[in-house]
């Protein structure tokens, strides 16, 4: 656990709940077609809230006037056939990706051999990764929403190959321990009515020889794609009786012995919330009323 312990107290802060609810209502009103968004029990989203008027502000002034020429940036939400993603243009990758797993979605006509990694043209060219960034880097293009989770249609699987759904991942991790965690997530669809998965990168601090803590990470390619120090995966599990269970994992972006049980990588959800700036528990409790968090050693 030494690989995990040092960094899991980084507090980036997040005031996300009200903005998420506002965005949710706007999205529901704008699009009546049922989809993944309408079924999510939790939506940790760093969306921009509306700009309220300020009493006593001079005529022609106030927050609304400040946005006259637009705001330089707000959270970039992207809804795909198989997942919802919040994009971080600074790192050239996702803040988080949320997907829903059900048994019927794990089988179908989706064929990985027909897929290719491709740029996300919905992201400005200044802020997106390219395949050239990964070439010769020594890192895999590691899926956040796994391709094997979405065999139900070729389009759903194709969408997992956007580079916005990818992060630089150490090959040994990607192909072994992380792959085992993805397989385990899929296996839970045999036990639970719904399995919601939220996956994302972490950039955790380390204490160095001078006794000070620093957040340092490598970047690759001409677009400076950030290499996460760790990855998290949060599983929100709906049992048939309505109970909600939560399992939250963190793995270092480094070779991990796949013989180590996955339980070893369970962490308290609070550590991920503090480190990522995201909130899960308040939104889940607002919808479910109760929650059972599974941690290492718990039954």
Swiss-Prot record:
SMART domains: Endonuclease_NS, NUC. SUPFAM superfamilies: His-Me finger endonucleases. The modification Phosphoserine is found at residue 290. The modification Phosphothreonine is found at residue 130. The active site is at 143 (proton acceptor). Its cofactor is Mg(2+). GO terms for cellular component: mitochondrial inner membrane; mitochondrion; nucleus. It is found in: Mitochondrion. Its EC number is 3.1.30.-. It holds the Pfam family Endonuclease_NS. One of its GO terms (biological process) is mitochondrial DNA catabolic process. Keywords: Disulfide bond, Endonuclease, Hydrolase, Magnesium, Manganese, Metal-binding, Mitochondrion, Nuclease, Phosphoprotein, Transit peptide. GO terms for molecular function: DNA endonuclease activity; magnesium ion binding; nucleic acid binding; protein homodimerization activity; RNA endonuclease activity; single-stranded DNA endodeoxyribonuclease activity. Mg(2+) binds at residue 174. The record marks 112 as: Essential for catalytic activity. GSK3-beta-mediated dual phosphorylations at Thr-130 and Ser-290 is necessary for its interaction with YWHAG and the induction of autophagy. Residues 1-48 form a transit peptide. CDD domains: NUC. Endonuclease that preferentially catalyzes the cleavage of double-stranded 5-hydroxymethylcytosine (5hmC)-modified DNA. The 5hmC-modified nucleotide does not increase the binding affinity, but instead increases the efficiency of cutting and specifies the site of cleavage for the modified DNAs. Shows significantly higher affinity for four- stranded Holliday junction over duplex and single-stranded DNAs. Promotes conservative recombination when the DNA is 5hmC-modified. Belongs to the DNA/RNA non-specific endonuclease family. Homodimer; disulfide-linked. Homodimerization is essential for its activity. Interacts with YWHAG. This is Endonuclease G, mitochondrial. It comes from Bos taurus (Bovine). The lineage of its organism: Eukaryota, Metazoa, Chordata, Craniata, Vertebrata.
């Amino acid at each position: 656990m030494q690989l995990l312990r040092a960094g899991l107290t980084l507090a980036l802060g997040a005031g996300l709940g009200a903005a998420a609810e506002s965005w949710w209502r706007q999205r529901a009103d704008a699009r009546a077609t049922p989809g993944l968004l309408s079924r999510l029990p939790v939506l940790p989203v760093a969306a921009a809230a509306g700009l309220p008027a300020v009493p006593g502000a001079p005529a022609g002034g106030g927050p609304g006037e400040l946005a006259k020429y637009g705001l330089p940036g707000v959270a970039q939400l992207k809804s795909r056939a198989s997942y919802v993603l919040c994009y971080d243009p600074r790192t050239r990758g996702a803040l988080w990706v949320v997907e829903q797993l059900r048994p019927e979605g794990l089988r179908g006509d989706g064929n990985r051999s027909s897929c290719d990694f491709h740029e996300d043209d919905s992201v400005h060219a200044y802020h997106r990764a390219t395949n050239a960034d990964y070439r010769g880097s020594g890192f895999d293009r590691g899926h956040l929403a796994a391709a094997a989770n979405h065999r139900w249609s070729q389009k759903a699987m194709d969408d997992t190959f956007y580079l916005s759904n990818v992060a630089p991942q150490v090959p040994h991790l990607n192909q072994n321990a992380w792959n085992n965690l993805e397989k385990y997530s899929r296996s839970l669809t045999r036990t639970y009515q719904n399995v919601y998965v939220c996956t994302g990168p972490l950039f955790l601090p380390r204490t160095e020889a001078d006794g000070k803590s620093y957040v340092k990470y490598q970047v690759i390619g001409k677009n400076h794609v950030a290499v996460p120090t760790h990855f998290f995966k949060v599983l929100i599990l709906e049992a048939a009786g309505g109970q909600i269970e939560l399992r939250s994992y963190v793995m270092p972006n480094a070779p991990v012995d796949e013989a180590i049980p996955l339980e070893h990588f369970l962490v308290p959800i609070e550590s991920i919330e503090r480190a990522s700036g995201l909130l899960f528990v308040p939104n889940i409790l607002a919808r479910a009323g109760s929650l059972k968090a599974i941690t290492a050693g718990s039954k």
